[in-house]
From Swiss-Prot:
Molecular function terms, GO-annotated: ribosomal large subunit binding
Keyword Glycoprotein: no
Family as reported in the entry's similarity comment: Belongs to the RRF family.
Cross-referenced SUPFAM superfamilies: Ribosome recycling factor, RRF
Cited InterPro entries: Ribosome_recyc_fac (IPR002661), Ribosome_recyc_fac_dom (IPR023584), RRF_sf (IPR036191)
Function: Responsible for the release of ribosomes from messenger RNA at the termination of protein biosynthesis. May increase the efficiency of translation by recycling ribosomes from one round of translation to another.
Protein name (Swiss-Prot/TrEMBL): Ribosome-recycling factor
Annotated organism of origin: Xanthomonas euvesicatoria pv. vesicatoria (strain 85-10)
CDD domains noted in UniProt: RRF (cd00520)
Subcellular location: Cytoplasm
C-alpha cells in the first residue's frame, strides 16, 4: 500500500515536470523552434485545428520558421491565426509558403520572459508540494486506520520528502536551463 502511494506520488511529480517542460517550449527564445507555434489554432474545416495538423513547420536559417500548408486554400486563415496569437510575429506569404522571421529579443523582453519562466517554475513547485501533501495525508490515513505502523509511516513520509526534493531540484534545473537559453544572445 505504501509502495503504491510512493509510486503514485513519483508519477504525478514526473508529470508535473513534463508539463513544465512542455509549457516552456512555447516561450520564445532567440532561436526558432516549431514548438513555438504549438498553441496556435486555425479555423479549418469548421473547427479550431492545431496549426501542426494543417501544415508542416520547419526551421530555416536559425531565426525563421517556414510553414508549408497541406491545403493551399488556408493561407489566409493561417495568417489570421498567427496575427491573433500573442507571439508578436509577422507572417510573410511567399507563394504557397508562409515565413515567420523571429526578430532578436530585446534585453527588456528577455528579462520579462525570464520572470515568466521563473513563475512557471514556482507553479510547478507548488503542484509538487501539493502532491507531497496528498501522499503524506494518505499515509496518515493508513496510520490512523492502523494499516501501517508508525515506523513504516515515518519511513514512507521520509521517502516522499526525498522524491519531493528531487522533483524540486529537477524543476530548478529546467528553469535554470531555460533562463540561460533566454539570456544567450
Amino acid at each position: 500500500m505504501l509502495t503504491q502511494i510512493k509510486q503514485d506520488a513519483q508519477t504525478r511529480m514526473t508529470k508535473s515536470i513534463d508539463a513544465l517542460r512542455h509549457s516552456l517550449t512555447t516561450i520564445r527564445t532567440g532561436r526558432a523552434s516549431p514548438a513555438l507555434l504549438d498553441g496556435i489554432k486555425v479555423k479549418a474545416y469548421g473547427a479550431d485545428t492545431p496549426l501542426n495538423q494543417v501544415a508542416s513547420i520547419s526551421v530555416s536559417e536559425g531565426r525563421s520558421l517556414v510553414i508549408s500548408l497541406f491545403d493551399k486554400g488556408m493561407i489566409k486563415d493561417v495568417e489570421k491565426a498567427i496575427y491573433a496569437s500573442d507571439l508578436g510575429l509577422t507572417p510573410t506569404v511567399v507563394g504557397t509558403v508562409i515565413r515567420l522571421n523571429l526578430p532578436p529579443l530585446t534585453e527588456e523582453r528577455r528579462k520579462e520572459l525570464s520572470k515568466s519562466v521563473h513563475g512557471e517554475g514556482e507553479d510547478s513547485k507548488v503542484a509538487i508540494r501539493n502532491i507531497r501533501r496528498d501522499a503524506n495525508q494518505q499515509v496518515k490515513d493508513l496510520l490512523k486506520d492502523k494499516a501501517v505502523t508508525e515506523d513504516e509511516a515515518r519511513s514512507a513520509e521520509d521517502d516522499i520528502q526525498k522524491l519531493t526534493d528531487k522533483a524540486i531540484k529537477d524543476v530548478d534545473e529546467v528553469v535554470k536551463g531555460k533562463e540561460q537559453e533566454l539570456m544567450t544572445v
